[in-house]
């Protein structure tokens, strides 16, 4: 038996004796027998992964520390959308570094997500107040993506009858790059200047622009309004604390990055972007929206609103392919605003503006030409032929400034900038700081009050803030409290040793456009990770740029698109997708300019190979791609996977391999060996980056050799087709995956996969006598997850899958994935990290729930008044003076009788009214004046 270092044993839940007991329950002599039965021989990797030997936690931290120590952290004045920040320690320790916040899942189960939903609601309120627009989503991936998404909203608003987009000012280069990538497959015409015509869907107004200048856009905005074009403001949210809200000067939408609200630069990410819109656009915006509703007893409760817009329901007709966004970072930004309050935010903004104004005045006094007259934080100076020399001199003093071209430099101030910095920077131009007025746009200063809501005025002491964040966290159920058995989500351990480096100075505080020689630690770490992921998947090249799984899908499909175009086959636009696919698949295909053709599945869940063959041959002249999830979304290793790939290749298409279920393959099989041409890998699933309550995520893609030239580029690297604002996307959290692979080694990764498959098969075995297990493969085995058919309870007792999901809360569990991929069922994925004790506790709860349903079926409890129909039960409901239910209080809150009351999770609200919440949409808190 292989001896593993302590970390491997600590990452994997079942002990050796547990593994033996679980295998015995399955009637198997060994793990090898299980893998032989579950995983088709035709795809199995018959060698060990060629990865570095596993290190202990201490040794891995030391090695990574040495690598990241090669980075040279200098004070950045580069700007261009990335700024130095002071993350309040109370937020860093109690939110950013707190597993109660970072291990939570997207808040689909609202009753156990009230804490993070509340803080996201405050984020939306913050954005609405800053922009003056009534509706904001709960974050997008980055500023560049948000601009592209806003353009998509404008085109949908015009029902795609308009396709021209006017960039009315100078946006950051990376934003233009991402917009151009998005525009090509969707047929958008990107123009610059001020000419608005009848085909213009929207104008994009930077506020301020990449030079730091507030331009005069009054005429182009008036022209846009006259022509019916929408106005999109790209606005700095710190500047908006002292500048007039964009809605006041005609913006229909506003977007930007909330990074400077307490979130470190992190060499490019992750950061939360914002998007706010006018009311008429509410139902076509992308991303999650948190709304306020009520629970079954009329108490205010938060929930995800308007989900019918999203990809998991609307598929190729969705408003976006985005699912995971940046919830953790949005919550940090909201907490930053709550901590400082409106006066504190304005003080930061005024100080930044004053430094920039004094710097501008000093340069003007020295005869240096600067761009514009109305500035906030950035001064762009003309220095003919001297840009590189001045930047080099700044570098010697430990400061980085932006080289725009050979004759132009930019200097951006932020909340970390000091008087000493101002003096040193002025000296580069042969001058000294002078007094200067804060140069805002005349008539555009913020006159009205903002953030008058009580929450932004109530937490000024650290004691209050610490307890506020604790109260919110206590409302939620995250991995630090219990198992989250969500199918297709891989909620595994996010080990402390993996998370620690994210906060290191050498990881968190580098600008993504810092000189290459100063980021050699990142270069080495990302190079390691790319090589390891290539070995794990079998591909020739990897891009780490996509900052979510959805963006990985998009990047992979765009690589396929560009490959076909380069071969003179740009007409290939048909994407075959099984009916069982994740909703992001068709949504991503549509974004990549492809038309979706659905491939049928057989009654046993497998892809209908005859239907695939017929449709591939029918569309052979135009076939671009086939998207497949493996193991299937039904949790089964399909025997015909290689044949599927051959059919597609024979008809001129490329195979896109959805890596959502890669946790069942690592060390056992490789997508490229199976026949895939491209695959995205969810580092926030298989490779231990936490879900953060709805982001961040990372979705790198691996590609075969012929697709390597078509991986995403970046304007800073002299290439194009970027899908994210930064070259390495959410770079700072890549260290989590580096640590995971380094501490597991090839053998440990394989062992984790085997344990995940064992845990899932053990659950299927324990539950199959009570609930049908819908789909199994050869030898009656599942992969790493299983579908439990709770419709038997509906048939016998009228108990719905939602009743079961909410009752599991009373048992102390987050519900499994509900009604997907099969309506009325639960899909359970335990991962390798859950111990046998917790797995048995879940199985016991599911069996007990079936027993409770039988009492309803037998008439012991009425169909409309029983513990399942009334679940979940709150403390206040249970402690009510009157108890009129036919079951006892103990049966309500300590079901099964054997559950430890000291470990009881109390949901803060009872069942939330979803329908009422959508009918009466409330997605931000009204200002105090609204109550007058």
UniProtKB/Swiss-Prot annotation:
Enzyme Commission code: 1.4.4.2
Cofactors: pyridoxal 5'-phosphate
A GO molecular function held by the record: pyridoxal phosphate binding
Role, per record: The glycine cleavage system catalyzes the degradation of glycine. The P protein binds the alpha-amino group of glycine through its pyridoxal phosphate cofactor; CO(2) is released and the remaining methylamine moiety is then transferred to the lipoamide cofactor of the H protein.
The family this protein is said to belong to: Belongs to the GcvP family.
Lineage: Bacteria, Pseudomonadati, Pseudomonadota, Alphaproteobacteria, Hyphomicrobiales
One CC-aspect GO term: glycine cleavage complex
Alphabetic keyword roster: Oxidoreductase, Pyridoxal phosphate
Gene: gcvP
SUPFAM superfamilies xref list: PLP-dependent transferases
Quaternary structure and interacting proteins, as annotated: The glycine cleavage system is composed of four proteins: P, T, L and H.
InterPro entries noted in UniProt: GcvP (IPR003437), GDC-P_C (IPR049316), GDC-P_N (IPR049315), GDC_P (IPR020581), PyrdxlP-dep_Trfase (IPR015424), PyrdxlP-dep_Trfase_major (IPR015421), PyrdxlP-dep_Trfase_small (IPR015422)
Residues with PTM N6-(pyridoxal phosphate)lysine: 685
Enzymatic reactions: N(6)-[(R)-lipoyl]-L-lysyl-[glycine-cleavage complex H protein] + glycine + H(+) = N(6)-[(R)-S(8)-aminomethyldihydrolipoyl]-L-lysyl-[glycine-cleavage complex H protein] + CO2
Name recorded for this polypeptide: Glycine dehydrogenase (decarboxylating)
GO aspect biological process, one term: glycine decarboxylation via glycine cleavage system
